[in-house]
């Protein structure tokens, strides 16, 4: 009888604690009109490109030249980036998890610490892991099965199951404590209703954007349109994954058992996702 390998739960929680007490970035970078928080491989570039296109139309400013992140940074950049358009809303984006004090009611309400509204973009963790592996498999140099087990210390991979669960856990707590300031968007819902959710994102940031500009931005964000706006100088040439198998097909029975055990033990909120696996032929 095969015995599953013990989960490195203690190492995971220790790494989360170290990160949670040492990452002051979001407490430091507070003076923005809105902050886009995105789980890695959740459609960050796509959402930023659509938002940037809509803002450019609304404000009569140059649209992003290419779909790559650098072009969208003109409107939604790293918190440390200088502001390019003074008349545009000041927006920033990051993949970061917040400091342990970030969701302190005493700090926010008792001491009156200003924090901007946040939009948190998440994705089914199983699909995000496949996407990350597809992008970085040459660099990782391991099988998907090995990659899936990850590194709870956060050193081996750019993103893995442990980093994904840490992100989901921390932002679930923030959303639970401050629901009015935190708007969570699932990638799958954004795919199904991009115009509706793009409008809600701007509304959450209290930014007025005309409906026709949102519609035009969604059209610009189609795969065909984005494929025509790839930067010829960029090494990134693909908009979609090389392997078009459904993400669930990457996981064999042993992988599914490991994933189920990890999320059951370590994930505190499922973010509305159904972790059951599709039945073959069903």
Name each model feature, range by range.
Residues 55-60, 197-209:
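Non-catalytic, well-ordered alpha-helical segments in soluble enzyme domains
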Residues 62-66, 210-215:
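A short coil-to-beta-strand element that immediately follows conserved catalytic motifs
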Residues 97, 124, 188, 220-223:
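Short, solvent-exposed coil/turn elements at secondary-structure transition points
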Residues 216-265:
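PAPS-dependent sulfotransferase catalytic core
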């Amino acid at each position: 009888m095969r015995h599953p390998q013990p989960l490195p739960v203690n190492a995971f929680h220790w790494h989360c604690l170290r990160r949670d007490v040492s990452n002051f970035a979001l407490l430091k970078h507070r003076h923005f009109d809105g902050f886009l928080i995105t789980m890695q491989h959740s459609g960050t570039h796509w959402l930023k490109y659509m938002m940037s296109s809509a803002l450019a139309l609304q404000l009569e400013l140059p649209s992003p030249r290419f779909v790559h992140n650098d072009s969208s940074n003109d409107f939604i950049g790293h918190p440390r980036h200088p502001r390019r358009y003074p008349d545009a809303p000041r927006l920033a984006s990051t993949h970061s998890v917040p400091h342990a004090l970030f969701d302190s009611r005493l700090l926010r309400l008792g001491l009156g610490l200003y924090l901007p509204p946040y939009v948190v973009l998440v994705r089914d963790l199983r699909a995000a892991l496949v996407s990350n592996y597809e992008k970085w498999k040459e660099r990782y140099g391991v099988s998907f099965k090995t990659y899936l087990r990850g590194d709870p210390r956060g050193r081996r991979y750019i993103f893995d199951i442990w980093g994904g669960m840490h992100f989901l856990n921390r932002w679930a707590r923030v959303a639970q404590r401050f629901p009015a300031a935190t708007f969570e968007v699932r990638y799958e819902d954004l795919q199904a209703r991009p115009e509706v959710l793009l409008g809600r994102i701007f509304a959450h940031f209290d930014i007025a954007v005309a409906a026709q500009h949102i519609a035009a931005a969604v059209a610009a964000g189609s795969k065909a349109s984005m494929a025509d706006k790839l930067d010829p100088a960029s090494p990134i040439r693909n908009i979609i994954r090389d392997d078009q198998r459904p993400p669930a097909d990457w996981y064999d029975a042993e992988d599914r058992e490991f994933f189920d055990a990890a999320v059951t033990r370590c994930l505190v909120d499922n973010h509305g996702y159904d972790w059951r696996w599709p039945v073959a032929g069903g």
